[in-house]
Amino acid sequence: MISIMMKVSLAVFMLAGGIIKVSRVPFQVEHWRHYQYPLWFLTVTGILEIAGALAMTAGIWNRYAAIGAGVLFVVLMAGAIHAHMFRARQSVIMAIQAMICLIVSIMIIMGSYT
């Protein structure tokens, strides 16, 4: 039950983030410029987040989908942490959401092997 709640929570969070990126909401575009990434990468990242959210939802029934989505999210969240802390030189506080998603993704991956 906890595993399902973690998967659903992570999927909803990532889906929302993906939609915000693909829609190019002004505050997200501003953040992306601050990270000094090209705007096409914003769209690609959003599409990957949406695809991962769908795969994580499928992961409720298929552990391989959960593992694949978890690995994708680990890569994306490592990139998000890097963007906040090193590219934009923000404090650790700005990267907390990405760190939580990274930890939850790792927990889902590890839990899928049992």
UniProtKB/Swiss-Prot annotation:
**Location, primary (coarse class):** membrane
Report TM segments: 38-60, 64-86, 91-113
Where does it localize?
A: Cell membrane
Q: What is this protein called?
A: Uncharacterized protein YdgD
Q: How does it sit in the membrane?
A: Multi-pass membrane protein
Keyword vocabulary terms for this entry: Cell membrane, Membrane, Transmembrane, Transmembrane helix
The family database entries (InterPro entries) matched by this protein are listed as: DoxX (IPR032808)
Give Gene Ontology CC terms.
plasma membrane
One Pfam family per UniProt: DoxX_2
